[in-house]
């Protein structure tokens, strides 16, 4: 579309789709089947794998919201078959957390969720509307976080956890099996 802005140094698969009013920065990589619907902003050292779909007004790969960040090299990796809905924000890592934010495969990020710097998210995770994750959060596979919940920084949520809506997660929630 004529209204999109794609930096000449971005690596875009011929099988990716970029809709109107999208911005794709110079160090961005978009794989086969990635679809930016419209009004999507992607920058930084961001790599998005196959068949991920991103909806309007998502902001991906912008500078971390951390006062210690001093423009050091960092990255954001988003796996395959993710759905990133409207107004979602995802930040890359910081030096204090290994400089990487990593998102697995087959995840759903609903409207207005926020994935802060240095988060590690497994596969098949669902994060409902208006859920912010603080920095350095780890979410293992097959987790569901209900709407309007909040997850404090440096928290770990174990596989198969189901967190009800409007929950404040202040401590680690690890998977345990019944005895």
Tell what function each PLM region has:
Residues 1-174:
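Structural signal for interior beta-strand "rungs" in well-ordered beta-sheet cores
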Residues 175-179:
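Conserved small/polar residues in nucleotide/adenosyl-binding loops
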């Amino acid at each position: 579309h004529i209204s999109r802005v794609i930096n000449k140094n971005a690596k875009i698969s011929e099988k990716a789709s970029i809709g109107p009013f999208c911005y794709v920065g110079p160090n961005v990589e978009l794989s086969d089947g990635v679809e930016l619907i419209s009004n999507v902003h992607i920058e930084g050292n961001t790599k998005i794998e196959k068949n991920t779909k991103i909806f309007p007004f998502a902001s991906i790969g912008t500078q971390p919201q951390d006062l210690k960040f001093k423009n050091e090299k960092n990255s954001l990796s988003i796996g395959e078959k993710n759905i990133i809905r409207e107004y979602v924000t995802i930040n890359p890592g910081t030096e204090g957390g290994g400089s990487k934010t990593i998102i697995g495969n087959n995840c759903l990020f609903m409207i207005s969720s926020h994935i802060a710097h240095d988060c590690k998210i497994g596969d098949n995770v669902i994060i409902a509307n208006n859920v912010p994750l603080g920095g350095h959060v780890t979410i293992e596979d097959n987790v569901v976080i209900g709407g309007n919940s909040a997850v404090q920084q440096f928290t770990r949520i174990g596989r198969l956890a189901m967190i009800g809506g409007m929950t404040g997660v202040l401590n680690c929630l690890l998977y345990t099996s019944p005895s």
